[in-house]
Curated annotation (Swiss-Prot):
HAMAP family, sorted: UPF0735
Listed name of the protein: UPF0735 ACT domain-containing protein Amet_0565
NCBIfam families: PRK04435.1
Family, as annotated: Belongs to the UPF0735 family.
InterPro entries: ACT-like_dom_sf, ACT_dom, UPF0735_ACT_dom-cont
The ACT domain, residue ranges: 73-148
Length: 149
């Protein structure tokens, strides 16, 4: 069995996380937004122990915090419609992410596969918000994060 050094990161849907990890994120958000002043207030409000908070606080972050200043590679599946890629790129530009590379397959059966590498350092919104905005574009079928550096 291979030993883990603790440096591996995973993207996990919140539905699969234990409640203590979700409460840790919630407590951190309360502190960050200034809704509470102390850790004691934050953990009381979310209903967790201070020891659990301290145990996990340095190991759980929303995706947008982990991705700030990183290179993100996304895979998009788009319907083959005029202007759809342009709309996606406009959303990226509005977020002030920097497109490092973009690759598009030749559309087959009305579908185009796109991979885009973005540098997120200057983004004005988090990556989750950008994905939500891109998913609202007519013809965007699916968006996946493939990698982050």
């Amino acid at each position: 069995m291979m030993e883990r050094d603790g440096g591996t990161h995973y993207i996990v849907n919140e539905k699969a996380l234990p409640i203590v990890l979700l409460k840790t994120v919630e407590a951190k958000e309360l502190l960050k937004k200034g809704e509470v002043v102390t850790i004691h207030e934050a953990v009381d409000r979310v209903g967790m122990s201070r020891s659990a908070y301290y145990k996990y606080k340095d190991y759980i972050f929303p995706l947008y915090e982990m991705n700030k200043g990183k290179i993100i590679t996304m895979h998009l599946i788009l319907k083959h419609l005029p202007g759809i890629l342009s709309e996606v790129l406009n959303q990226i530009a509005e977020s002030e992410a920097s497109v490092l590379t973009i690759n598009q397959s030749i559309p087959a059966h009305g579908i185009a596969n796109i991979s885009v590498a973005l540098e997120t350092r200057q983004m004005t919104i988090n990556i989750e918000e950008l994905i939500l905005k891109m998913e609202q574009i007519k013809g965007v079928q699916k968006i996946n994060i493939l990698a982050q550096e």
